[in-house]
Amino acid sequence: MEGMRRPTPTVYVGRVPIGGAHPIAVQSMTNTPTRDVEATTAQVLELHRAGSEIVRLTVNDEEAAKAVPEIKRRLLAEGAEVPLVGDFHFNGHLLLRKYPKMAEALDKFRINPGTLGRGRHKDEHFAEMIRIAMDLGKPVRIGANWGSLDPALLTELMDRNARRPEPKSAHEVVLEALVESAVRAYEAALEMGLGEDKLVLSAKVSKARDLVWVYRELARRTQAPLHLGLTEAGMGVKGIVASAAALAPLLLEGIGDTIRVSLTPAPGEPRTKEVEVAQEILQALGLRAFAPEVTSCPGCGRTTSTFFQELAEEVSRRLKERLPEWRARYPGVEELKVAVMGCVVNGPGESKHAHIGISLPGAGEEPKAPVYADGKLLTILKGEGIAEEFLRLVEDYVKTRFAPKA
């Protein structure tokens, strides 16, 4: 999979590389008021510990700007060297100019070309932000969004479209304007002297099919590393499915160097859900491994017992519980594949494909459960202690398979 990646320059955000041959980075964004130092620091730590490699926070006013250096200081005091991205709209040029310590504390600036102002002021504000980034050696993400397109650019492209022999739909022109907005800003930044190794590009929409078209165009027209994500994925299952549907085609084509899943969290749901989903998408596509994986069948009329479901749940829980210690002791354990299957139809075959797997008896089958490791029959379990015995075998397998080489 990694060999299919679209070639780009490498951009370092803090110590995290984006683009080139580097792993696709997982990002997230806080939803706390940045001016609230305690709450924002706590949420950045929570996101980072969940696996977010880069965290973005809004810098929308002077109080937020003043808070950024203290947030950074507290994170470092906790041993969290997580890169922080400042999200600027409307007044970013003013805040970066007035609060240099804030600018220094950030690891990347996000600039939306649609929220910089109008006319010549837009160009001046953009130029000032790029100059500050260059002076400090900071990378920039030019992040266009179809919800905040420059009206002048949209009007220009609508007028041009009206003169075509066969005009495109208004929706198609909006998507073209989104790409054009991002590309023009990217080219302007390069002309000002910002290096290719300091530029990341994004252009977000809220529909999966549209996102695929937009990013294929960005990949065709630029060499920049690309930040993928729907601008608003939505809540729950809908948001998860929409994000996976939008990102998977692009990632499988080698397009995309960092991702963020913009879920709307349900009341009381942790913000870290977006990190978990982003990791699951990358792992499902075989692009990264973050944690051991459990494969289990959905069940059917042959699996009248719920035991295989209970065992799959218990194995998943135990792997998650053991992962912090395993990571420290057994390099590569994130690659572990475990199968928990419910009957003889696919059970043995799926178990052989996993590192270690168990095929439980289905309805009418002999009450025994063969266990396979590395494609070979390891043992056959029987009786009441199958669950605990299988978990012990998994633990032993990890110690043997992933033990550091002497």
Curated annotation (Swiss-Prot):
Output the GO biological process annotations, alphabetical, semicolon-separated: isopentenyl diphosphate biosynthetic process, methylerythritol 4-phosphate pathway; terpenoid biosynthetic process
Which reactions does this protein catalyse?
(2E)-4-hydroxy-3-methylbut-2-enyl diphosphate + oxidized [flavodoxin] + H2O + 2 H(+) = 2-C-methyl-D-erythritol 2,4-cyclic diphosphate + reduced [flavodoxin]
Enzyme Commission numbers on file: 1.17.7.3
User: What GO molecular functions are on record for this protein?
Assistant: 4 iron, 4 sulfur cluster binding; 4-hydroxy-3-methylbut-2-en-1-yl diphosphate synthase activity (ferredoxin); 4-hydroxy-3-methylbut-2-enyl-diphosphate synthase activity (flavodoxin); iron ion binding
Question: Where does the chain bind [4Fe-4S] cluster?
Answer: C297, C300, C343, E350
Q: Which InterPro entries match?
A: Dihydropteroate_synth-like_sf (IPR011005), IspG_bac (IPR016425), IspG_bac-typ (IPR004588), NO2/SO3_Rdtase_4Fe4S_sf (IPR045854)
Asked if the keyword Protease belongs to this entry, the reply reads no
Note describing how the cofactor binds: Binds 1 [4Fe-4S] cluster.
Q: What pathway does the annotation place this protein in?
A: Isoprenoid biosynthesis; isopentenyl diphosphate biosynthesis via DXP pathway; isopentenyl diphosphate from 1-deoxy-D-xylulose 5-phosphate: step 5/6
Keyword terms, alphabetized: 4Fe-4S, Iron, Iron-sulfur, Isoprene biosynthesis, Metal-binding, Oxidoreductase
Needs which cofactor?
[4Fe-4S] cluster
Enzyme class, top EC level, equals oxidoreductase
Give the NCBIfam families listed for this entry: ispG_gcpE (TIGR00612), PRK00366.1 (NF001540)
Q: What does this protein do?
A: Converts 2C-methyl-D-erythritol 2,4-cyclodiphosphate (ME-2,4cPP) into 1-hydroxy-2-methyl-2-(E)-butenyl 4-diphosphate.
Family the entry assigns = Belongs to the IspG family.
Its protein name is 4-hydroxy-3-methylbut-2-en-1-yl diphosphate synthase (flavodoxin)
Source taxonomy = Bacteria, Thermotogati, Deinococcota, Deinococci, Thermales
Please name the gene that encodes this protein: ispG
